[in-house]
């Protein structure tokens, strides 16, 4: 039995019932022995395909008696992961949460247009040692990006993720940003890399967004060919969703794989988080072969 998990992506309308319906509609084809490559034509990119694709990888590893890491040709191991500080009304509260996450060397900060510089300044004072990533979640316009980016650079921010709304970021073409810009919502899969190039310097790969590990590997390879940096992220998921994403983390420049830490209950004996790193589970519940 192959195992996989799909959390879905809200802006793809990936509600649980919709994902279940997609899988049920394709059940006969899947059960007949569909390949991972054939699955790309059967299910659209999103959480449903992610779940099935990762289950097929797990099943393939069992049949081959080789781990997924071995099948892909990467060495299994831990990666540094960011810890996310959510947007709050009080910048001081955000700084306190960043300080409490002292074992994490990378802090990802959610921002909008309300006092972003004040928030980052407070967090920087609390965590002078941390590498700071800013995620605007499509919350600025081009003028705000131009206004805020230089000061964020001076405060030691490493890059800005998705500053402008998807479909409203054409102005980035030709813009020389003082900080690298990372496309999240603006890069769903490999088909959008040509548009991303020249506007962004990095992409955030999420398996729920691109539709599984197979698509994520293709997206990572395509991005590298274009000279783009790589980040891997996750939707809110258990360790079963993080296990395949960790493979992309081994290929990426940055990882944001803290999803299970935000849950009350995780997959039993899930991924191990220690010293700001995420380690493969010793229980080997996915991809072990």
Regions found by a protein language model. Name each.
Residues 1-132, 139-146, 150-154, 269-289:
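N-terminal capping/lid subdomain adjacent to the active-site entrance of alpha/beta enzymes
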Residues 36, 68-71, 159-163, 234-235:
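Flexible, glycine/charged-enriched surface loops at secondary-structure junctions
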Residues 52, 65, 107, 135, ...:
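Conserved, mostly hydrophobic/aromatic
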Residues 84-86, 105-115, 131-139, 155-168, ...:
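Catalytic beta/alpha-barrel core
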Residues 90-91, 112-128, 140-145, 164-176, ...:
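Active-site-adjacent beta->alpha loops and helix N-cap segments on the catalytic face
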Residues 128, 157, 228:
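Short phosphate-binding/catalytic loops that engage adenosine nucleotides
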Residues 167-258:
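Catalytic alpha/beta core domains of metabolic enzymes, predominantly
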Residues 233-289:
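Flexible C-terminal active-site loop/helix
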């Amino acid at each position: 039995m192959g195992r996989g998990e799909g959390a879905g992506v809200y802006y793809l309308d990936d509600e649980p019932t919709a994902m279940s319906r997609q899988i049920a509609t394709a059940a006969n084809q899947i059960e007949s022995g569909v390949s991972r490559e054939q699955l790309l034509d059967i299910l659209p990119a999103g959480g449903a395909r992610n779940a099935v694709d990762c289950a097929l990888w797990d099943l393939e590893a069992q049949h081959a008696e080789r781990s997924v890491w071995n099948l892909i040709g990467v060495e299994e191991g831990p990666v540094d992961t960011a810890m996310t500080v959510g947007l709050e009304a009080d910048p001081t509260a955000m700084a306190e949460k960043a300080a409490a996450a002292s074992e994490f060397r990378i802090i990802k900060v959610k921002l909008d247009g309300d006092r972003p510089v004040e928030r980052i300044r407070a967090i920087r004072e609390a965590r002078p040692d941390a590498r700071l990533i800013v995620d605007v979640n499509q919350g600025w316009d081009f003028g705000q990006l131009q206004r805020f980016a230089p000061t964020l650079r001076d405060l030691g921010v490493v890059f800005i993720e998705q500053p402008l709304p998807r479909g409203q970021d054409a102005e980035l073409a030709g813009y020389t940003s003082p900080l690298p810009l990372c496309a999240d919502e603006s890069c769903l899969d490999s088909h959008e890399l040509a548009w991303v190039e020249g506007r962004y310097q990095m992409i955030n790969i999420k398996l729920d967004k691109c539709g599984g590990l197979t698509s994520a590997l293709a997206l990572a390879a395509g991005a590298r060919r274009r000279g783009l940096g790589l980040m891997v992220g996750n939707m809110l998921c258990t360790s079963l969703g993080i296990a395949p994403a960790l493979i992309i983390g081994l290929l990426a420049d940055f990882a944001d794989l803290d999803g299970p830490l935000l849950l009350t209950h995780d997959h039993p004996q899930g991924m191990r988080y220690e010293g700001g790193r995420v380690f493969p589970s010793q229980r080997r519940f996915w991809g072990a072969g």
